[in-house]
């Protein structure tokens, strides 16, 4: 329920000292007074109406301004201050004196749209702590509505309702609302992508949350990797401990894949190609990260490339896509990015894994930069890395776990050998496991390298969303306090 504005009129009482006599001149004066009061009334009513309108307009301007002021009173550091030295805000202060604030991040990926609602607390003079996350996902991805933009709004509104239910009413106008689109929209023609973003922005503007001009955007791949790196290192406590040993991040999405880590060797910095290094400022510290996103090498896009298809285009004349990575007896359909392809296996002249590995190597040839330092950095991997490993029993499906890179190759050989004679319900498993095995080796990981695969840390999703909302809040801080 929206708060209304109550206007009350006030009356001033005038005291007139009159002569006790009641002669003819007093009677005439009363008539003049009555006549004058009518004229005053005719002027007073329009004047009062104008004053009322002025007060209302002033109130609306004040109300809008306080939305931004309320947010910064909770999150903005004073010039030169560290996180935790923010101005006190009664709106965002818990009973124990810790400041409380929220952030909403929409992840518009290639296979679905997800909302993350984060609640943070900040003890005095310390970095923030994540105290709660609400997560909900809807399918298909936003890019599926490229030719019917109006339909995209329904899912966005449904996810906004999740945020409204999770965030107390008094915090709505102070809570930043952001949507970042990833590979799904990056692969769309520019005009179609912009129409989708404009529709989402219109829905956001109608919401009660704090919405900036940059609230909706397509996230570039580098930022996606950086944000995921922030998430992992925040959840593992590294960012709270100056000088702590950071961990690297591997994310395998549907349309793109990212790698990010903090180099410790000068040679890594010098050998990195242009565009692979980025400076990140968080919690008043600056990090120089190795971060890169490979568009088209996400698991679903890689499948299409291995099959010989072209992104966003149906096969010519409905032609069947034949692949050495599928069971020789398999025939079926596969849908990707709203396009349905007819696919089939082919008779194998050698082992299925051997032929598939050769095809995958062709797709990956000269597309991935290899760096030696990854051998010596602890890495977390998630998204499709996790799903594939859990699907073949390499890790616990609920808890995650650790494995060595070579485990993917062992699993790939086993699954491919099984598919040669026993087609099963996962026709792409040989292809996917072979692809992941070779992709990791192309990055420079030896078969003996241990990776930690996790879906959640402290019950929080290990996606880029948390890091992105932190980065967004930090950028708002710097806009308001350039000296900080």
Residue ranges and their predicted role:
Residues 62-81, 127-131, 483-484:
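Interhelical loop segments of eukaryotic multi-pass membrane proteins
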């Amino acid at each position: 329920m929206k708060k209304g504005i109550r206007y009350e009129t006030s009356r001033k009482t005038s005291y007139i000292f009159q002569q006790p006599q009641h002669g003819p001149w007093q009677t005439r004066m009363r008539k003049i007074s009555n006549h004058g009061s009518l004229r005053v009334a005719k002027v007073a009513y329009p004047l009062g109406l104008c004053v009322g309108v002025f007060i209302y307009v002033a109130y609306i301007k004040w109300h809008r301004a306080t939305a931004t002021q309320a947010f910064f009173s909770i999150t903005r550091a004073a010039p030169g201050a560290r996180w935790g030295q923010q101005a006190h805000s009664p709106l965002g202060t818990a009973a124990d004196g810790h400041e409380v604030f929220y952030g909403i991040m929409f992840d518009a990926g290639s296979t679905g749209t997800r909302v993350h609602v984060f609640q943070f607390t900040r003890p005095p003079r310390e970095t923030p702590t994540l105290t709660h996350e609400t997560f909900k996902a809807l399918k298909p991805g936003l890019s599926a509505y490229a030719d019917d933009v109006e339909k995209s709004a329904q899912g966005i509104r449904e996810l906004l309702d999740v945020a409204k239910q999770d965030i107390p009413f008094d915090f709505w106008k102070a809570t930043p609302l952001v949507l970042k689109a990833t590979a799904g929209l990056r692969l769309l023609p520019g005009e179609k992508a912009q129409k989708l973003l404009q529709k989402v922005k219109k829905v956001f503007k109608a919401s009660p949350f704090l919405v900036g001009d940059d609230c909706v955007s397509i996230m570039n791949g580098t930022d996606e990797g950086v944000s995921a790196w922030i998430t992992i290192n925040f959840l593992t406590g590294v960012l709270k401990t100056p000088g702590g040993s950071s961990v690297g991040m591997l994310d395998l999405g549907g349309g793109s894949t990212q790698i990010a880590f903090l180099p410790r060797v000068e040679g890594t910095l010098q050998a990195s190609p242009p565009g692979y290094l980025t400076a990140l400022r968080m919690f008043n510290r600056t990090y120089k990260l190795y971060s890169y996103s490979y568009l088209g090498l996400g698991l679903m896009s890689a499948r299409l490339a291995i099959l010989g298809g072209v992104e966003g285009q149906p096969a010519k004349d409905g032609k069947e896509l034949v692949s050495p990575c599928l069971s020789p007896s398999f025939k079926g359909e596969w849908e990707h990015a709203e396009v349905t392809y007819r696919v089939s296996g082919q008779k194998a002249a050698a082992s299925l894994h051997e032929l598939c590995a050769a095809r995958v190597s062709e797709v990956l040839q000269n597309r991935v930069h290899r760096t030696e330092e990854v051998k010596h950095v602890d890495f977390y991997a998630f998204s499709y890395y996790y799903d594939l490993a859990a699907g073949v029993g390499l890790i616990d499906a609920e808890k995650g776990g650790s494995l060595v890179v070579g485990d993917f190759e062992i699993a790939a050989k086993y699954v491919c050998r099984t598919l040669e004679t026993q087609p099963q319900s996962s026709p792409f498993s040989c292809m996917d496991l072979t692809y992941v095995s070779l992709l990791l080796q192309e990055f420079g990981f030896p078969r003996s390298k241990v990776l930690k695969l996790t879906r959640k840390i402290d019950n929080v999703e290990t996606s880029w969303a948390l890091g992105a909302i932190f980065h967004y809040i930090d950028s708002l801080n710097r806009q308001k306090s350039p000296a900080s």
